[in-house]
């Protein structure tokens, strides 16, 4: 049994569809014409969208004004599109009694089903099913297709639940800059400036960088890459653990 609680009905502007429109209106189910649906913007998504048309189905194959693609935008994930086409049985008359005409009729209907199935497939629908039944005045074609939920994991995982997830990838770790504050009170700046100064003579001073800590990774590269508050400002580029000698006579 179909749940009509979140359903939109799209109908063509013809007499049989007008009768359907009245029935759906009595059930308080929203309806809209195919022409209005193409022109207007819908501000809601639906679990089910029904489309009815009598005789005409060419608009479903129009690539310049793709109604199947627009319908998909207003379907919820895993929502169902239900297309119902009523086609006149031109071969079902008093003069038609040959097997050849009946066979031609079946081929025409199968080609229509094949084309519409392809269009649904090309527009990204999945679980497409087709069915044809014979009515009093012709043939009824029914096509059901589902709007896929391929992006479910992306939509659900946009929010970060813990700090560890921020640093999950190595690339992200490289982008994180954790600088020392100028007015540091937590001891991080003091730890970062833990350079062992060894005076060789009056002209030279040597710094041991064995215990050097660089939060941003730029401290080792030289003044051109260091921030204004870098504790190693003035020292040449060095490798961690390397002893750095400064000539005090050079201005």
UniProtKB/Swiss-Prot annotation:
Its main location: cytoplasm. The keyword RNA-binding does not apply. Its cofactor is [2Fe-2S] cluster; [4Fe-4S] cluster. [4Fe-4S] cluster binds at residues 216, 219, 227, 230. Residues 155-167 are annotated as: Linker. It is found in: Cytoplasm; Mitochondrion intermembrane space. A motif (Cx2C motif 1) lies at residues 216-219. It comes from the Eukaryota. Residues 1-154 are annotated as: N-terminal SAM-like domain. GO terms for molecular function: 2 iron, 2 sulfur cluster binding; 4 iron, 4 sulfur cluster binding; electron transfer activity; metal ion binding. A motif (Cx2C motif 2) lies at residues 227-230. The keyword Metal-binding applies. The C-terminal domain binds 2 Fe-S clusters but is otherwise mostly in an intrinsically disordered conformation. Belongs to the anamorsin family. Monomer. PANTHER family: ANAMORSIN (PTHR13273:SF14). This is Anamorsin homolog.
């Amino acid at each position: 049994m179909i749940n009509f609680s979140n359903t939109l009905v799209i109908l063509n502007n013809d007499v049989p569809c007008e009768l359907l429109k009245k029935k759906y209106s009595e059930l308080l189910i929203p309806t809209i014409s195919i022409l209005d649906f193409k022109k207007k913007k819908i501000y809601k998504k639906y679990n089910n969208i029904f489309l009815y048309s009598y005789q005409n189905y060419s608009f479903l194959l129009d690539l310049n004004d793709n109604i199947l693609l627009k319908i998909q935008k207003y379907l919820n994930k895993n929502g169902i599109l239900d297309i119902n086409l009523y086609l006149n049985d031109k071969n079902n008359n008093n003069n038609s009694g040959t097997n050849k005409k009946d066979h031609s009729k079946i081929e025409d209907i199968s080609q229509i089903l094949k084309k519409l199935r392809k269009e649904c497939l090309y527009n990204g629908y999945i679980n497409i099913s087709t069915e044809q039944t014979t009515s009093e005045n012709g043939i009824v074609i029914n096509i059901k297709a589902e709007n896929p939920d391929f992006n479910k994991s992306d939509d659900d995982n946009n929010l970060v639940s813990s700090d560890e997830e921020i640093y999950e990838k190595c690339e992200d770790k490289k982008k994180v800059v954790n600088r020392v504050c100028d007015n540091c009170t937590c001891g991080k700046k003091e730890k970062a400036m833990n350079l062992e100064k060894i005076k060789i003579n009056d002209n030279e001073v040597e710094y041991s960088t064995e215990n050097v800590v660089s939060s941003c990774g730029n401290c080792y590269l030289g003044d051109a890459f260091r921030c204004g508050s870098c504790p190693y400002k003035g020292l040449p580029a060095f490798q961690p653990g390397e002893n750095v000698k400064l000539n005090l006579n050079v201005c």
